[in-house]
């Protein structure tokens, strides 16, 4: 990670850390780096989620892009994977998404995609950072007819939804789906998509007002959708995050089906129909031990990467793997998309339910899970906390006690000032004990307040 770019673009408190001035400079520097080799006028697509700060940052970013001569196509409110898909399929030079995903409304972020629809590599981000830190802006300043221009392309969302519909061989008639749009980017898109596929649709979290994104709703609060599924008697619940790149599902009994289970269900089905490249699923170190055991029992291989969907995608691209993802709900179907896509994951999950005739609870029950506990601690110095001798000592002590019968993972968040402490063990009581012992040491030495 660099000075400005984290694991998922540039993020911060809008108008405090991520200011319109910084957005303008990102438009100029990012636009220049991504378009400098173009022989014709570069075309850049911009989408955003529903945050109140989105329009402020969008306008500043557009001004920067226009100042280096780009044509800007404004997509309006759309999901992150929607921007990635349209960037790739419309021969755009670059795409930009303005969102802080599952973060609270005060935050926002700016994420760039290359012309291939993939997030930028580290070298490109560092080149942009170098220009941001230059004392003087010496980038080209075209004038007259060479200046850029902007126009709206709101029909891009319909083109993206059409692609999603085409990924299913089944219609979803007879399936009642409950949708939680997190008051975010999928609020209008997801009900339209699943309605077009003939599902019966009930919704919560689909009335954004600029301030309520992720507020008690969405994939980080799936318990609310679980209650709604039971209330409506739905067959399945689909909970998206603010920018629509992740999915947490709910079965008909109100039980949460996380990214690990979704990956297993989809991987098993794809393997059975001969569409899982090398029988391999790419996951991260956060995936449950139960996921790894069950994947192996079904004749598949699970590879591990660092946490972050960019690292999953990186590994997938090396060997053209077709399925990967994270426990948090980022699922990548490389046959269709270049990034995690919550709505695409939902379509694939419902297609499997329809094709197999099985309830989601039946599909999910094939993968048992080890009890797991995750605690987030807001800290003053996440790197210092990770490397502190007291923290390292308690981690070593707990791992020795586990003696291989479970695991501990302590890591710094890539997008927030948090240290995450996770444990898996044969019992929930053991999980809780191990996590609290480590978390208490982190709190005593580095905590600001617990999240």
UniProtKB/Swiss-Prot annotation:
Its EC number is 5.4.2.10. It is an enzyme of class 5 (isomerase). PROSITE patterns: PGM_PMM. Its cofactor is Mg(2+). The active site is at 101 (phosphoserine intermediate). Mg(2+) binds at residues 101, 241, 243, 245. GO terms for molecular function: magnesium ion binding; phosphoglucosamine mutase activity; phosphomannomutase activity. Transmembrane segments: none annotated. GO terms for biological process: carbohydrate metabolic process; peptidoglycan biosynthetic process; UDP-N-acetylglucosamine biosynthetic process. Belongs to the phosphohexose mutase family. This is Phosphoglucosamine mutase. It comes from Exiguobacterium sibiricum (strain DSM 17290 / CCUG 55495 / CIP 109462 / JCM 13490 / 255-15).
